[in-house]
Design a protein with these regions (language model features):
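Short His-centered aromatic/hydrophobic patch
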Residues: 85-92, 109
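Aromatic "clamp/platform" in nucleotide-sugar-dependent glycosyltransferases that forms part
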Residues: 245, 264
Length: 358
């Protein structure tokens, strides 16, 4: 059995990390594991296992005939059985299946705005879903949506899992050791960094030595500009630091004391699982399937989204008792290692692959 993971880029986002994790994890579980990135390469290319077959299409437009031909020929030459398409790459995968009807197509839905599914564009997805052999959804809301909206019978919920990357530390965080709060999230509106900044500004009134560290891709857009403007306007330049995309996230988290997610909407965020693997005490908004990871107060703090005061209080609570915070972090680490493991997820994936190809 030969399987190709299809993804739009290898920038350090959640769906991209999942595609790389699957390609790497399946190397010794199936006959051959491949990854194709369609539009762009990125930081995560360096994390691919040397035994993963790799293709970069450099696709320039939605229907790029040259890219379609290259992928079609690659799949033919390598005798690939399954395309596992992540996110918006479903369209290209569908075109390839039309050219090779015997090919099996699995779509992985990573949609990050699961709180706002009513506004999700679905016409093209609905059309293409007729050609899907299976859909994996990253949270239960997306699973229900796929079952009721799309034209495919086989749908299942598959939680994300995180793996520690072994990249050497290259990013030295600013601030005082033991007083760092980290937010691992690309600079997108649904991540609601502005709410976090407002809450952290209030924290600084009583805890001026603490610092906030934002790690994630900067798209240099209006949202990004609003974050920098807030920092400058409120004179937070010596307390809040922005690093952009980083390949050494596991090493970065080892330098931090508290992990935070302030999102308005999520699927099942990889950042939450990465915080857990690092043993960090975590504060997260109660969106998507975050409550499946943090089930009670022993495992972290779940707060309402867009609630600055609740976020401020949660940060101050951990800061006021770091010993208890460390215990909470250890409980979450145990939970993530046992309930969101790589081994159990890959076993489910391989079983599904075997089912659709038999």
């Amino acid at each position: 059995m030969k399987v190709l993971q299809l993804i739009d880029s290898l920038e350090a986002g959640g769906a991209e990390r999942v595609a790389v994790n699957y390609a790497n994890g399946l190397v010794h579980m199936i006959d051959a594991s491949y990854l194709c990135t369609t539009r762009a390469e990125g930081l995560l290319k360096g994390e691919l296992n040397k035994d993963v077959g790799y293709l970069f299409l450099n696709k320039k437009k939605t229907i790029d005939v040259k890219a379609i031909k290259r992928l079609h020929q690659f799949i033919k030459n390598e005798d690939i059985d399954i395309i596992h398409a992540h996110g918006s790459s479903f369209f290209l995968a569908t075109l390839i299946k039309l050219l090779q009807p015997k090919l099996k197509l699995v779509w992985h839905d990573h949609y990050g705005k699961s709180e706002f599914l009513k506004h999700r564009p679905k016409q093209m997805l609905k059309l293409c879903s007729r050609f899907f052999n299976h859909i994996f959804s990253v949270n239960s809301k997306l699973e229900t949506w796929a079952k009721t909206t799309l034209k495919v019978k086989s749908v299942s919920y598959l939680p994300n899992y995180a793996v520690k990357n072994n990249n050497a530390l290259t990013t030295k965080l600013k601030g005082v050791e033991g007083k760092r709060i980290v937010c691992l999230a690309n600079l997108r509106p649904q991540k609601d960094h502005l709410n976090l900044l407002k809450a952290f500004k209030a924290v600084l009134k009583t805890e001026p030595m603490w610092t906030l560290h934002l790690v994630g891709q900067d798209f240099n857009d209006a949202y990004s500009k609003s974050i920098f403007e807030f920092i400058n306007l409120n004179k937070l330049e010596t307390s809040v630091f922005i690093y952009g995309s980083c390949a050494d996230t596991s090493a970065i988290l080892q330098q931090c004391t508290i992990g935070v997610l302030s999102s308005k909407s999520e699927g099942l965020p990889l950042a939450l699982l990465e915080y857990g693997l690092a043993g960090l005490p975590v504060i997260s908004t109660n969106v998507g399937d975050c409550s499946l990871v943090i089930c009670d107060v022993k495992e972290g703090k779940l707060i309402p989204s867009e609630n600055t005061i609740a976020l401020q209080k949660a940060m101050l609570h951990f800061i006021s008792d770091l010993k208890q915070a460390k215990t909470v972090g250890n409980h979450l680490k145990n939970k993530v290692e046992h309930s969101f493991s790589e081994a159990s997820a890959l076993k489910k994936i391989r079983l599904l692959y075997q089912t659709i190809t038999s």
